[in-house]
Design a protein with these regions (language model features):
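Non-catalytic helical/linker scaffolds that mediate oligomerization, partner binding
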Residues: 1-478
């Protein structure tokens, strides 16, 4: 039986705690499907070694793993701090400067050179994912003087957020282009674009990748308030989204995050685009062997709401328990998935189809979903070139695995981001998919009485009809 216990895909950020070959093999066996490299940290040499280790660990374990490069984008950060962490106390004076200095408890540098022009007295600034709040009191040519409103500890290179202030900067920076070029040259499968505002930001990234001769799977990170207003355009341009709750939770009131998360998932599910839910999912496991009850519930609710992936950040990158964190995600997912209520995408489709163009892969997807309301097959086998039909079916979050068979290795890697899809690379693209399915099921010792098979036109068989077949394994002759 090749299928794991959990259908939710696990994305793990790789860092000093997890970048060794042995640890990578361990967390792959524990359930990691996608390895995330945060290009806001580290250098190209270290990332190159990590990529090589991930590929080697994937080969050694015999398990498919996709690699995602998370581009920094125009993220504003403070600079280096001596004797960190520093402690900021309410009513303290604290200065942000565009000068390159080593920071201390009174002053730190910032990466955004236009900060003094962008803010004015009375504006609120946030550091370290909103844990530290400042109010601007005075602005000079190179310095922004502030009063500490909410204090806390601060370390080097933590983020700076300016909610509600239009900075007029592109989401795809020159440094992003350098990172993209490196990632493509080193065989990275997917790219995460930070601080996306509109679909045009994704198009700029895609055009840059095409200029380099590549077509990566592109994840739009939703972490700005403005992105929610342009979500349809972003989803049309991107291959999937990440709900990056750290920066998003600073950009919008924190009490609105839960509803925003649900709405983002619903829209992405409708459009058949995979969703990654990220930030602080098991934050306490950075230092503790077990998560809090609230964290376990957070992961569970994201799965119940329709996420395709759940993601670890510091827990797996620099925490004390990277392996235990991955195993815990897998445990929670396996326990929660059987309790997921039927997702209501079908009713949404039926509303949308009134007067609109009907897409064939939507019809196939709803037919498969309706069939699985009556039977429980061993798997749904979907031959696919681009992965579109498989993702269209996967949005229903079915109770059985979808076996997506493709002649494209890229498609197999892309499908690692989709809930409940098991990718199989079949370079020859057989003439008889029914015979292939029976042989594959037997070779993998997949148990069950029934299998659902979908077929459609292909480059080899352009006139083949779209159809769905239920195969009774008990009636097949050897």
């Amino acid at each position: 039986m090749p299928f794991p216990a959990n259908k939710t895909k696990l994305v793990c950020t790789i860092g000093p705690a997890s970048d060794s070959l042995q640890m990578l093999e361990n967390i792959i066996r524990a359930g990691m499907n996608v390895a995330r490299l945060n290009f806001s940290h580290g250098d190209f040499d270290s990332h190159k070694k990590t990529i090589a280790n991930i590929r080697a660990a994937s080969r050694n374990t015999g398990k498919r793993v996709a690699i995602m490069a998370d581009l920094p984008g125009p993220k504003m950060r403070i600079g280096e701090i001596a004797d960190e962490p520093i402690a900021l106390t309410p009513d303290d004076s604290f200065t942000l400067t565009t000068q390159e200095i080593i920071g201390d408890a009174n002053r730190v540098s910032v990466s955004f050179s236009q900060l003094p022009e962008a803010v004015k007295p009375g504006d609120k600034l946030f550091l370290n994912d909103g844990y530290v709040e400042l109010e601007v009191t005075q602005v000079d040519a190179t310095e922004v003087h502030c009063k500490v409103i909410v204090g806390g500890h601060l370390r080097s290179r933590k983020g700076l957020n300016l909610p509600g202030i239009d900075l007029g900067i592109s989401a795809f920076t020159d440094h992003d282009h350098e990172c993209l070029k490196f990632a493509m040259e080193n065989g990275v499968d997917a790219v995460g674009q930070s601080f996306v505002e509109t679909g045009a930001d994704i198009e700029a990234l895609r055009q840059a990748a095409e200029g380099l001769g590549h077509d990566p799977f592109i994840i739009a990170k939703i972490e700005r308030a403005g992105a929610r207003k342009h979500l349809t355009g972003i989803l049309q341009a991107a291959d999937g989204i990440m709900i990056a709750r750290g920066d998003l939770g600073v950009e919008i009131p924190i009490e609105q995050i839960a509803v925003a998360q649900k709405n983002l998932m619903r829209q992405a599910n409708l459009m058949g685009k995979p969703v990654i839910t990220a930030t602080q999912m098991l934050e306490s496991m950075t230092t503790n062997r077990r998560p809090t009850r609230a964290e376990a519930t957070d992961v569970a609710n994201a799965i119940l709401d329709g996420t395709d992936c759940v993601m670890l950040s510091g827990e797996s990158a620099m925490g004390n328990y990277p392996l235990e964190s991955v195993a815990m995600l897998a445990r929670i997912a396996a326990a929660i998935e059987p309790h997921r209520a039927a997702y209501s995408v079908k009713q949404i489709f039926q509303t949308r189809w009134e007067g609109d163009h009907i897409l064939l892969h939507d019809i196939i997807a709803t037919s498969v979903e309706s069939t699985l309301n009556r039977i429980t097959p061993a798997s749904v086998i979907v031959p696919t070139h681009s992965g579109t039909t498989a993702r269209s079916i996967a949005r229903f979050k079915l109770p059985v695995w979808i076996t997506a068979v493709s002649s494209s290795e890229k498609t197999c890697q892309d499908l690692m981001f989709s809930y409940g899809i098991w990718s199989v690379h079949e370079p020859d693209h057989p003439d008889d998919w029914k015979s292939w399915s029976l042989k594959w099921l037997k070779s993998q010792e997949v148990s069950g009485d029934l299998v659902v098979l979908t077929e459609g036109p292909s480059a080899k068989h352009p006139h083949r009809n779209n159809r769905m077949e239920i195969i009774d394994l008990g009636r097949q002759v050897e």
